[in-house]
Amino acid sequence: MGNCCVTPEGSGRGRKKQQQEQKQKQKEPKQQQQQQKKGKKPNPFSIEYNRSSAPSGHRLVVLREPTGRDIAARYELGGELGRGEFGVTYLCTERETGDAYACKSISKKKLRTAVDIEDVRREVDIMRHLPKHPNIVTLRDTYEDDNAVHLVMELCEGGELFDRIVARGHYTERAAALVTRTIVEVVQMCHKHGVMHRDLKPENFLFANKKETAALKAIDFGLSVFFTPGERFTEIVGSPYYMAPEVLKRNYGPEVDVWSAGVILYILLCGVPPFWAETEQGVAQAIIRSVIDFKRDPWPRVSDNAKDLVKGMLNPDPRRRLNAQQVLDHPWLQNIKKAPNVNLGETVKARLQQFSVMNKFKKHALRVIAEHLSVEEVAGIKDMFEKMDLNKDNMINFDELKLGLHKLGHQMADADVQILMDAADVDGNGSLDYGEFVALSVHLRKIGNDEHLHKAFAYFDRNQSGYIEIDELRESLADDLGANHEEVINAIIRDVDTDKDGKISYDEFAAMMKAGTDWRKASRQYSRERFTSLSLKLQKDGSLQLTTTQ
């Protein structure tokens, strides 16, 4: 990868960025280049490389220096291991040696915008840039053909973090300390090499194999980014439960990774997230308040040292928050062998399993939703833009947007229309050009109706009765359930079935999907816009005080 493998320095990174911007500019349509000449900042979400209007012979190139084009020449792809927003992970076998690997195949049809493409490109750059580490999955080879990008990686067969904990008969504070140390060592190594992870959560860690001594490995760097000392970031990314307050304030640095690791530690010790609410806005407000509950079971039995570390990692002021080295130097992690080896109780294990399986229930639904987020969704947007643009100046102002939304059936207060306008109006000129409108339209199609959520519900409602019954839930989650599966199924039904009729209605399913998390993360673009919009809303109602962090 040439310069991509060098530790980012200020001047070197600047040259690299200039080269990328120059290449990017050559790809942009004339209209966007003209906008830049006028000092207008284009919306990166709207630069669509997969549109049918692309020049004849245009071939989307994602990776800078792939290993090759034909993955089948060296590897044989096997069964599916998992599915995400952009692609599918397969078991793959090296033909020459018979060694097994994981292959993440990313469909180019799913990479609609410049941001999507840059995310994949940067993920590869970062995995190649980071030195070999026992707790980070190794990227072996990369391939790119006309249809997809293929990332061949080390295979992790030991399962997810919470599943391993639940499977063990005895779960203690000492076990939580060992996991925390591993996660923070990964954070420390990333920061040392100029990488901020930005999406630390239990699902992004897998065990290498099923042995008791298996290494825990970080597997996903899709939202990670290079940084230089003192550099601040404004883009809202990550997963709601694990998001630091300064991310919502859109002014953050690598300290956010320690916060996320602190959230994981809190969950490891008591089985529930520290900041939770019924809505994503409620979660955001809980994060901003940063009040930590140490009263619920089992906290009275947890050592003072463990609580002290949680407080240090979840300090809402990033300047006073512990850094990765300070976390590793903390007495609780320095004296792991002295950490209490007393069972934290079945309550914590049950909560962890419920939290894990509920996430998997949502993930199954997200998978169905993601499969329906096709390129065809943006069809007709140009026609909609022209109809809304009443004065034909190729821009949509506030009044045109409000009237157009009304005609489309979106009954919105002026304040909410303004929030949408602020979120989509990247250049801040008070009007939306076509590029900004493309991003907003994809956003509106998610909040205007729940067609994708209906499709996900229909997937679980296999007998089309209008309800998800206990047998259907059991069958859908069969691969994710352990020995005490009936207990978990009953816990899910108990939580989701609010009218207590023994089955899950569509309204109950929709409420679960929207509670405390952003189900629309099936579209990463949408999620970014959604949380930017939420941040603006909280700022306006006084919940969010934007402060400058040195």
UniProtKB/Swiss-Prot annotation:
SMART domains hit by this protein: EFh (SM00054), S_TKc (SM00220)
Lipidation (N-myristoyl glycine): G2
Compartments, as annotated in UniProt: Membrane
Membrane topology listed for this record: Lipid-anchor
Catalytic center residues: D199
GO molecular function: ATP binding; calcium ion binding; calcium-dependent protein serine/threonine kinase activity; calcium/calmodulin-dependent protein kinase activity; calmodulin binding; protein serine kinase activity
Source organism superkingdom: Eukaryota
Tissue: Expressed in roots and leaf blades.
Binding site for Ca(2+) 2: D425, D427, N429, S431, E436
Region of interest (Disordered), ranges: 1-58
UniProt keyword terms in alphabetical order: ATP-binding, Calcium, Kinase, Lipoprotein, Membrane, Metal-binding, Myristate, Nucleotide-binding, Repeat, Serine/threonine-protein kinase, Transferase
Domain EF-hand: 376-411, 412-447, 448-483, 484-519
InterPro entries: CDPK_Ser/Thr_kinases, EF-hand-dom_pair, EF_Hand_1_Ca_BS, EF_hand_dom, Kinase-like_dom_sf, Prot_kinase_dom, Protein_kinase_ATP_BS, Ser/Thr_kinase_AS
Biological process terms in GO annotation: intracellular signal transduction
Function per UniProt: May play a role in signal transduction pathways that involve calcium as a second messenger.
Domain notes: There are 3 contiguous domains conserved in the CDPK subfamily: a kinase domain, an autoinhibitory (junction) domain and a calmodulin-like domain. The autoinhibitory domain (339-369) inactivates kinase activity under calcium-free conditions.
Name this polypeptide is given: Calcium-dependent protein kinase 20
Gene: CPK20
